[in-house]
């Protein structure tokens, strides 16, 4: 499966787009839509480069999800997982209760597991609370845009 435009919209909303390198709330040098690889202080990019970087990175995350998830997914469920993995990384998915719950076909238990991941450095962040709520709603095919 591949992420849809709706999944990309969720990521873009919660990542925001910065065309100049900055320190994110977790203290990591970031640019574009949450891009953290090989970012140096003072780096700048164009909007098109930010969009291209996001699409390029999504291929890797899609592959991880397609490999790790052993049950059938609807597009909206896949999109929610793409946002979660994009934000948290595939390593967290591999070791998560979320993946265990999902692969046990407990689809109703997944939104609760999504929402558990709302901390950075042990501190609950309001932005992560909102993002996880939006991802949980999308996973259930409910409107998420107003979160």
Stretches with model-predicted labels:
Residues 11, 77-85, 113-115:
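Short alpha-helical scaffolding segments that buttress acidic/His motifs in well-ordered protein cores
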Residues 1-28, 33-63, 68-72, 91-147:
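Long, amphipathic alpha-helical surface segments
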Residues 56, 83-88:
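Short, residue-level hotspots on alpha-helical faces of the histone-fold
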């Amino acid at each position: 499966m591949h992420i849809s435009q709706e999944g990309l919209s969720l990521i873009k909303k919660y990542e925001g787009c910065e065309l100049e390198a900055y320190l994110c709330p977790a203290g990591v040098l970031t640019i574009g839509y949450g891009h953290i690889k090989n970012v140096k202080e003072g780096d700048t990019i164009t909007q098109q480069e930010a969009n291209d970087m996001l699409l390029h990175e999504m291929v890797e995350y899609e592959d991880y999800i397609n490999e790790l998830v052993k049950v059938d997914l609807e597009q909206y469920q896949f999109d929610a997982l793409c946002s979660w993995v994009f934000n948290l990384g595939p390593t967290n998915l591999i070791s998560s209760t979320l993946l265990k719950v999902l692969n046990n076909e407990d689809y109703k238990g997944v939104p609760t597991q999504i929402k558990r991941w709302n901390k950075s450095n042990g501190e609950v962040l309001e932005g992560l609370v909102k993002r996880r709520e939006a991802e949980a709603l999308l996973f259930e095919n409910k409107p998420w845009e107003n979160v």
